[in-house]
Amino acid sequence: MKTQTIFFKNPAYIREVASIAGPKEAEGPIGSYFDKTVEDDSLGQKSFERAEVMMHTTTLKYLLNKAKMRSAQIDLCVSGDLSDEITGANFTMRSFDIPFLGIYSACASFAESIIVGSTFIDAGHMDRVICSVSSHFSSAERQYRFPLELGNQRTPLSQWTVTAAGALILDKDKGEVKVECATLGTVIDYGVKDANDLGAAMAPAATATLVSHFRCTGRKPDYYDAIFTGDLGEAGSRILRSLMIEEGYPLPDSYNDCGVLIFNREGQKVGQGGSGAACSASVFCSYIYKKMLNGELNRVLLVPTGALLSKTSGLQGETIPSIAHAVSFVKVQ
């Protein structure tokens, strides 16, 4: 194997970002950073699945409007979500006449979309690529755990799937933030079977990717102004810190988790914090990106994490394999 880390010779630059979040996310600590929030997570639709499609569609339209661009100016859209056969992304793209690639790495899908888009631009095949993902608490609960109508009690280690959509436009033309490099993750399985404890399942995958990234680049964790994992939650973040110490790469105080950032754990009763494909996407396309633009952060490593289970695998007693991909963003001086 050559290397898990790709340095882009012709890097993609972020042209614009957009984020729309649900009512619970709006009440969280970073609620003011989102472009738009909704008061009703059904968005007036007949099902939560349709609501997620509506939210994803609205986010892409808002993104194009912010960038003052038309669909015809976009060469490709790389999108994903958590629903069966990524119907959320597929149905969203019915509204756009844009070439489309649907991807899936569970809650690490946002990083995968950026890696795919950046690679197309680096190779000269595309000029502008949209990368987007969505997730919805109620549709995810129905698919992976229990329908809300059952009223099941949530476990202490459970996390709250983020209702949101995040999207950005990658451009070959120089901008303020570039995608410098990316580390592709491997599938890691530590034998966790509890679908209500995904932080424990995903932390080893985040560890493996971070260690590979630091070894491939020769960097230390403090090289970055901040490192953000996607949705390990409070318990998963503690496990990651412990594992990274064992590997000889202790994480600095500047490390944080998007799932911890997006909610007030105690006040909002969200268990260990946020999760979901849109957790890292919505936090990056609002809070993190704005801090990069204003110069508070110049070098950021984003490491979205994904639990690769399905409703069938859980019922069959399978363990939960996980993956994490890392993307390095640099503020252009």
Locations of regions flagged by a protein language model:
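Conserved beta-ketoacyl condensing-enzyme motif
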Residues: 14, 49-105, 223-238
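A short, structured active-site edge motif that brings together acidic residues
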Residues: 101-108, 256-259
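Short, well-ordered amphipathic alpha-helical segments that serve as non-catalytic structural scaffolds
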Residues: 52-68, 116, 201-216, 283-288
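Active-site-adjacent elements of ketosynthase-type condensing enzymes
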Residues: 81-97, 137-150, 236-237, 283, ...
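Short beta-strand segments
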Residues: 79-80, 129-135, 300-305
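Condensing-enzyme catalytic core mediating Claisen C-C bond formation in acyl metabolism
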Residues: 1-49, 147-211, 216-219, 252-269, ...
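Active-site-proximal alpha-helical scaffold in enzymes
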Residues: 104-131, 170, 275-296
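Short glycine/threonine-rich loop-to-helix capping motif typified by GTGT followed
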Residues: 90-93, 232-247, 312-319
